[in-house]
Regions:
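Well-ordered mid-protein domain cores that form the structural environment of catalytic cofactors
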Residues: 106-161
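Glycine-rich, mobile lid/loop segments that gate access to catalytic sites or pores
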Residues: 142-178, 183-184, 190
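Small-residue-rich anion-binding loops in enzyme active sites
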Residues: 39-115, 187-217
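Domain-scale recognition of functional cores that engage charged ligands
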Residues: 205, 209, 218-275, 279
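Active-site/ligand-binding loops adjacent to catalytic centers
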Residues: 180-228, 232, 285-373, 406-444
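Single conserved hydrophobic/aromatic residue that forms the stacking wall/gate
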Residues: 1-11
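Short glycine/serine/threonine-rich phosphate/pyrophosphate-binding segments
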Residues: 119, 125, 144-157, 177-178, ...
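A glycine- and small-aliphatic-rich helix-loop capping segment at beta-alpha/alpha-beta transitions
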Residues: 123-134, 158-168, 185-187, 275-281, ...
C-alpha cells in the first residue's frame, strides 16, 4: 500500500483505491471520474497546511480559507488566478455557524442556489471541468450523475449553461421529493433528466456500468459528477475549515467534535482529509439513519452492504456507500484506526421526527431530517468540555411535507425554491436495465 501521508501533497498524481489502475493526473481523475479498475481516485499524499494558517484562520474570509485549501489540493495543476476565480465563483454564498443549544452549533450549508451542501462541490466541479475542457479544446463531454435527491439539483444547476458539457441526471421514480425533482427537471438547456424505474442504487449501478463499458466510452466522452469524482468531494473540505474559523472567532475552537449526517460518505471523507491536513478536530461522528452500514462496520469490523431502505432522511438512504473505500484507504484499512477517530450513531424515523419536533419547540430552530440525525448524535454523544458542530445539509423547506407534518405548522419557502416550483417538469422514462440505458446513450 502506498502511504497517503507524505511530506508533499500533490494531487497531480492520483491513484485508485483498488491499486490496479495506472497513476493518473488531476485532469484525468476529474475528467474520468472513476479509475479503470473501478476504484476511486485518491491523492498520492496529503500535505498539512502550515501552523500560521491555523493561527490566523479566524481573520480570513470563507473564500480566502477555501483558496488556501484548494491550492494545497489543486495548485500544482491549475494557475493561481484561475483557481482563485473558480473558488470565488463557487462560493457566492455564506456558510454561517449558528448556535442551536449549549455547546452545539449548526453549520448551515443551505444558503446556495439549490439550498443544499452539494452546491459547493457541484459548482466547483462544473467550473473545474469547464476549465479542463476548454484547455483541451474538447467538445461535448457528457456528465452522468445518479441522485437520491440533492446531488441532481446541485450538479445540474452548477453545470447549467457551461459550454461543451451535457448533464444526464438519473433519479429513482417516485423516490425524490417534488421540490427536489423540480430543481433538475425544469432546467432544460444542457440538462436532461432520466426518470429510472428503480432505486437510487439502481441509478448508481447504471452510471458505473456506463463508465466501464468499452463501446460506450469509444462512442462518447463520459464523466461522473457523483462524489466518486475528486472535484466534487474535495471542495467539501472548504467548509470544515471555515467552521473551525468561526468556532475560533467565538472562542470555542478547543475540543471540536464534528457530526456528519452520512449517506454516500463523500461529505465525511472531505472532513477527514481536512483532519489529515492538520485541521484541529478532536473527533468525528457519522450519523446514519436506518441504513446504518457504517455503524455496523464500526461495531463488527465487517463491511456488509445491503439494499437500501426508504426513510424520511432520503439523501442518506444508501446501502453501499461509494466513499467507504476512500475512508478505508485513508486509514490503511485499519478498523482500529477508523474507530479511534470516527464514532457512529443510527436513528429511526421516529427518533428523527422527535428530534425535529423538540428542537423546534425548545430552541425555535428548524432542522431538516438529515440535520436532525446530526444534532441528535451530538445531544447523545457530546462529552463535557467538547463543542459540537453538525452539518445542516439542506434547507428544511426541501422536505416540506415531512417537516410540516412533524411540527404541525407551515414552513416558509425561500424565494429560490418558489422559483423552481413554478417550472414545468420534463423528464424521460428509463428502465433500470443497462442494455436500455446503453442503447439510449449510443443513439445520442
Amino acid at each position: 500500500l502506498r502511504s497517503l501521508v507524505g511530506s508533499e501533497m500533490c494531487i497531480r498524481d492520483s491513484y485508485s483505491t483498488n491499486k490496479q489502475a495506472p497513476i493518473a493526473s488531476l485532469q484525468e481523475a476529474v475528467v474520468k471520474g472513476l479509475a479503470a479498475d473501478k476504484g476511486l481516485f485518491m491523492p498520492m499524499s496529503i500535505k498539512p497546511l502550515p501552523q500560521e494558517f491555523y493561527d490566523m484562520i479566524d481573520t480570513l474570509s470563507f473564500q480566502e480559507i477555501a483558496y488556501r485549501v484548494a491550492d494545497a489540493f489543486f495548485g500544482e495543476d491549475i494557475p493561481a488566478e484561475t483557481l482563485k476565480q473558480i473558488v470565488y465563483d463557487t462560493l457566492s454564498f455564506d456558510v454561517p455557524l449558528v448556535k442551536v443549544s449549549e455547546n452545539i452549533y449548526s453549520l448551515e450549508l443551505f444558503h446556495g442556489p439549490t439550498l443544499a451542501f452539494k452546491d459547493v462541490g457541484g459548482r466547483f466541479m462544473a467550473r473545474l471541468l469547464g476549465y479542463f475542457i476548454k484547455k483541451e479544446g474538447q467538445k461535448n463531454v457528457n456528465v452522468l450523475v445518479a441522485t437520491s435527491g440533492d446531488t441532481g439539483s446541485a450538479v445540474a444547476n452548477g453545470f447549467l449553461g457551461v459550454e461543451g458539457i451535457h448533464v444526464y441526471v438519473l433519479y429513482p421514480k417516485g423516490k425524490v421529493s417534488e421540490i427536489q425533482e423540480k430543481q433538475f427537471t425544469t432546467l432544460g438547456q444542457n440538462i436532461t433528466a432520466l426518470e429510472v424505474d428503480g432505486t437510487f442504487d439502481d441509478c448508481q449501478a447504471l452510471v458505473k456500468s456506463a463508465f466501464m463499458d468499452k463501446e460506450l466510452n469509444e462512442h462518447l466522452s463520459l464523466t461522473s459528477a457523483n462524489s466518486i469524482n475528486v472535484a466534487r468531494f474535495l471542495p467539501q473540505a472548504f467548509y470544515y475549515f471555515y467552521a473551525y474559523a468561526q468556532l475560533k472567532r467565538a472562542g470555542k475552537a478547543d475540543n471540536a467534535v464534528i457530526c456528519v449526517p452520512s449517506g454516500n460518505f463523500g461529505n465525511i471523507t472531505a472532513g477527514l482529509f481536512g483532519k489529515k491536513m492538520g485541521l484541529p478536530v478532536k473527533r468525528f461522528i457519522a450519523a446514519n439513519n436506518r441504513n446504518d452500514i457504517f455503524y455496523q462496520y464500526l461495531q463488527t469490523g465487517k463491511y456488509s452492504p445491503r439494499p437500501s431502505i426508504a426513510t424520511i432522511a432520503n439523501a442518506m438512504d444508501v446501502g453501499d456507500p461509494s466513499n467507504f473505500a476512500r475512508v478505508l484507504d485513508l486509514y490503511g484499512g485499519s478498523h482500529a484506526a477508523i474507530s479511534a477517530e470516527i464514532s457512529g450513531t443510527t436513528y429511526t424515523d421516529e427518533q428523527i421526527r422527535e428530534t425535529v419536533k423538540e428542537t423546534w419547540k425548545d430552541h425555535h430552530y428548524l432542522l431538516d431530517p438529515h440535520g436532525a440525525c446530526g444534532y441528535r448524535a451530538l445531544m447523545d454523544g457530546l462529552q463535557p468540555g467538547e463543542t459540537g458542530v453538525f452539518l445542516e445539509t439542506a434547507h428544511p423547506a426541501k422536505f416540506l411535507e415531512t417537516v410540516e407534518g412533524i411540527i404541525g405548522e407551515a414552513v416558509e419557502i425561500p424565494a429560490k425554491l418558489q422559483e423552481f416550483m413554478k417550472g414545468e417538469k420534463k423528464s424521460l422514462p428509463m428502465s433500470k436495465d443497462f442494455a436500455d440505458f446503453k442503447k439510449y446513450l449510443l443513439a445520442l
